[in-house]
Every structure is written in structure tokens, then in C-alpha cells.
Amino acid sequence: MSSVYSDKSSSTPAVTGGGFGGEIMLFGVRVKVDPMRKSVSLNDLSQYEHPNANNNNNGGDNNESSKVAQDEGYASADDAVQHQSNSGRERKRGVPWTEEEHKLFLLGLQKVGKGDWRGISRNFVKTRTPTQVASHAQKYFLRRSNLNRRRRRSSLFDITTDSVSVMPIEEVENKQEIPVVAPATLPTTKTNAFPVAPTVGPIIFPVQIDKSREYPTLLRHDHGNSSMLVGPVPMFSMPNPSTAIDLNANHNSTIEPSSLSLRLSLSLDQGQASSTRHSAYNVMSSFSNGESIIRVA
């Protein structure tokens, strides 16, 4: 046994120093390097099996190496992520909110309150989803809280509930009311109100005179008709209508009451005969032909 170990110990520097490749002496045991390298790492066996091919493809196309790795089942996860990022490089941008939608959002915020984004989206901002309404509300409140800290350029969020009046959901229901057509009225002419003096015109009516009572002396000589119809004629002249109405700038006119009155004193009673002496009618009798004549002065 001692001779065996001595032989091995004596041969060890020869092996290592002689540069015999592929073997090493580990604790007196001769170990081959190539089988051991194959079992060192199982992560990249394809690189060990094709060392020359990988060295030649270092300056080549990376797509070919990735395809080979994918075919052998050892593709990297980073390559797959990079491939997906290349396909979705252009990010889909959302449609910005319009001023009308923001005003409807503020109106819904007044009516419904914070938190009910589904109700605001359903009843007010119908063009946006509840998630979009919630995101817009978050940006709005952040803008309002940071408003006093620093000045920012004007944006849509500067329109607040204070500046937006409560729209009669004329803009929501909206803003379109049919005007009621007023009925056409006839044109009226304005006349200056001024007092008009009452005019007294001649009143003509038949008067039947009974000669037998008022004038009993006529009965002796009158053998014909006992009564006759007389149309009285007024004793006064009618005034000019232009002088009866005084139109001045102040529309003040003083009209004296007419002192003329038509008195028809034709009474049938004997007791009133003396009071009718000054009547407008003068009765004269003529006995020449036996007839009574009535003359009007």
C-alpha cells in the first residue's frame, strides 16, 4: 500500500507539471476535467455543446441565436419581453376631455357628490366610463389642492364649480327650449285724453196741444179740428263745435254750463197756465176764417 501511494505521489507533479490536459489530481485521486465541466452548469448546455458555433455568431445577427435558443428550449425571458415591447412601442393615448364634458362633470359633482363616479358617468358624462371619470376627478382635486403653491399654465381644470353656474339641465337635457310665440295684438293708437264739452242738439218731437183746456176762448170760433201737431223749432242757435272744445297744451279747459235750456211749457193743467207765459211758442188766434193759428217766433 505504501508503494502504491508513493508511486502516485511521485507521479503527481509529473502529471500537473507535464501539462497532461484533461486530468487533475485531487486528494490523490485522478479526475478528468471534461466530464466534470459538462455537469458543472445545466443552464447553458447548448453553449457547451456548440462552442465553435457560438463563437462565430458573436458578431452575427442576434435574431438567429435567439431562434436557435428557442428551438433548443433555452430561450431567455428577456428576449420575449423585448419582442413584446417592440410590437407595442406606440402607446395608445386617450382622448382629452372637452370643456363641455368637464362642465357636465362639475354639474354631476354638485348634484351627486364625490365618490359616485358611476352615477356621474351614467347620468351626466355619458361619453366617459366610471374609471375615466374617477381619473379625471383625481386630477381635478390635485389641481385644486396645488393651485396656491405655484402658478401653472391655464388648463381645463381651472373651470371650477364656482365659475360654472347651475345649468338648468338645459345643457344636459339641454338648453333648447321652444320659444312661445306671443299672440299678435292689434296696434293701438294713443289719443290725448281731454275733456269734451257735451253738445246739446235740437230735440224735435211732436207736441199735441189741446186748445179746449188752455185756450177756452178758441172753442167758440173753432169748429174744425180740436188739436193739431206742431214741430217746435229751437229758439237758440247752435254754437260752433270748434269753439266748444278748447285744446291747449295743458289740456285744461273750463266749460261753462249752458244757460240755455229747452223748456216746453205745454202743460195740460189750468193751474200752470200762468207760469208758461214766457214760453218759446206764441199762440195767436185768427177769427177771420174761424181757425186758430199757431206761430213759432
Curated annotation (Swiss-Prot):
GO terms for cellular component: cytosol; nucleus. It is found in: Nucleus; Cytoplasm, Cytosol. The keyword Cytoplasm applies. Its main location: nucleus. GO terms for molecular function: transcription cis-regulatory region binding. CDD domains: SANT. Induction: Up-regulated by drought, high salinity, and ABA. Residues 44-96 are annotated as: Disordered. Residues 52-63 have a biased composition (Low complexity). Gene3D superfamilies: Homeodomain-like (1.10.10.60). One of its GO terms (biological process) is green leaf volatile biosynthetic process. Binds selectively to the DNA sequence 5'-[GA]GATAA-3' and may act as a transcription factor involved in the regulation of drought-responsive genes. Enhances stomatal closure in response to abscisic acid (ABA). Confers drought and salt tolerance. PANTHER family: F25A4.19 PROTEIN, TRANSCRIPTION FACTOR KUA1. This is Transcription factor MYB1R1. It comes from Solanum tuberosum.
